[in-house]
Design a protein with these regions (language model features):
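Right-hand nucleic-acid polymerase module
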Residues: 1-124, 134-257
Length: 257
């Protein structure tokens, strides 16, 4: 049932996946949480951290949804790009990555799609994980491109970097990659050096999940309605957890279509 004012089921519909969130408590549409008035002398740091935590959660959810919606049921490559130099400058690393993306876009035989996530090693050095539809790429070329861009950058005392390629052709491995990215995004997003910056980039041509909401009578405990929403699709993952803001329970399902 559709309602103009309230909902207790949230759907994110995509080409390859469907995400379902079923709320124990009915939620009003369009209601915004009022910001607390906090002086500069008290509470500012805590408020900034809470805001950042929410933003980080949204970013991770967005990237996992994009990975699953664009790369499940497909063949793709998972490329890890590292610097030999202990590079910790986020802006500099992202400049090098942007040049590399422009280079490898040219060798793609189809419209190039990608998701790239930054990760920090224990010593603080940056490296990247690049998911793209460039399946079984020419390893020699993609390695030469990465090394040559780094060598030409006078700011870096480095003679190149390394490239590791894993070709993915089944959904089990795709979900393994998705879980790996989720785990390390959680770690990276907490870095102070990323404050006000993104730890990921994506191509504009990715298929996005489309949101919709509905109101279903007693949806949280209504197994028939839950099964109808799942609609015989494969359950990739499921969870039940407590909403940090309302204190009420949420059921979550990620489905492969």
């Amino acid at each position: 049932m559709k309602s103009d004012n309230y909902y207790n089921v949230s759907l994110m519909e995509g080409e390859h996946v469907r995400e379902i969130r079923i709320f124990e408590k009915v939620k009003p549409k369009g209601k915004k949480v009022k910001r607390l008035h906090i002086t500069k002398k008290s509470g500012n740091k805590k408020t900034n951290m809470e805001s950042r935590t929410k933003s980080n959660h949204r970013a991770k959810k967005k990237i996992i949804g994009l990975i699953q919606n664009n790369f499940l049921n497909t063949k793709f490559s998972f490329i890890t790009l590292t610097f030999r130099y202990n590079l910790e400058d986020v802006s500099m690393a992202n400049e090098i990555l942007a040049k590399y993306i422009r280079k490898i876009r040219k060798i793609s035989k189809e419209e190039f799609k990608y998701i790239c996530v930054m990760e920090f090693q224990k010593r603080g050095a940056i490296h990247y994980h690049l998911i793209s539809n460039l399946y079984k790429p020419d390893y020699k070329k993609i390695h030469e491109y990465w090394a040559s861009i780094i060598k030409k950058d006078e700011r870096i005392k480095d003679d190149g970097g390394s490239v590791r390629v894993e070709n993915i052709s089944n959904n089990d491995d795709a979900m393994r990659i998705s879980s790996y990215i989720s785990k390390y995004m959680t770690k990276s997003l907490g870095k102070e050096s990323l404050f006000g910056k993104k730890c990921y980039s994506t191509s504009k041509n990715l298929s996005r999940l489309k949101p919709s909401n509905m109101l279903i009578d007693n949806a949280f405990n209504n197994e028939n309605e839950i099964n109808r929403l799942i609609d015989n699709n494969q359950i990739i993952s499921r969870a039940e957890y407590t909403d940090a803001y309302s204190g009420k329970r949420i059921k979550y399902y990620s489905l492969a279509k």
